């Protein structure tokens, strides 16, 4: 059986602006995200293709790493074939029941950690992918009691290695340097 899955969701900035396509690996709450120009199925498909291609160039397979994807019924996830298919096989896409975001509760919890840094209603339009990688790196580096004082980054890299984390744009932040507030992105 499947012991873990990849949760996928969007986090919106200002209405009509850029959004985050967020991914959360269920067993360790490791999160990575891509900055989308808009909340459309085409943008989701384009960024998923880029992630898959990036992994493929390093002889890694998206569908082997993430065989099961769980998301909601948002219109941005309508291109099922583009989400599931990969040159090396396919992932299986499952949708939560309507109005049951609790069925992907792990990513919802990480959304609250992202919102500590990017408050609800704030615009993502001036952010870069590097900013989003930094936000996710800080979220992944928070030590968690549920993981016996380990961080999501530590669990993920123990399982998959640092190369994959780096490919996904995530780096380790030392615990004393983790910032969980909007000042993380003060420039």
What label would you give each PLM region?
Residues 29-34, 95, 120:
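Short small-residue beta-strand/loop micro-motif enriched in glycine and branched aliphatics
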Residues 16, 33-59:
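Active-site beta-loop-alpha junctions of metal-dependent nucleic acid enzymes
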């Amino acid at each position: 059986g499947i012991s873990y899955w990849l949760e996928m969701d969007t986090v919106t900035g200002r209405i009509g602006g850029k959004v985050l396509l967020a991914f959360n690996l269920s067993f360790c709450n490791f999160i990575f995200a891509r900055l989308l120009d808009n909340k459309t199925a085409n943008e989701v498909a384009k960024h998923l293709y880029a992630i898959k291609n990036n992994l493929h160039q390093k002889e890694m397979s998206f569908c082997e790493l993430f065989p099961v994807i769980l998301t909601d019924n948002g219109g941005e996830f309508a291109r099922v074939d583009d989400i599931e298919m990969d040159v090396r096989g396919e992932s299986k896409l499952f949708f939560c029941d309507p109005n049951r975001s609790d069925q992907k509760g792990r990513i919802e919890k990480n959304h609250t950690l992202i919102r500590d840094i990017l408050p609800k209603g704030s615009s993502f339009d001036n952010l870069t992918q590097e900013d989003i990688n930094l936000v996710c790196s800080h979220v992944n580096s928070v030590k968690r009691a549920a993981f016996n004082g380990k961080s999501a980054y530590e669990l993920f890299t123990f399982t998959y290695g640092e190369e994959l984390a780096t490919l996904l744009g995530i780096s380790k932040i030392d615990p004393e340097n983790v910032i969980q507030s909007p000042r993380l992105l003060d420039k």
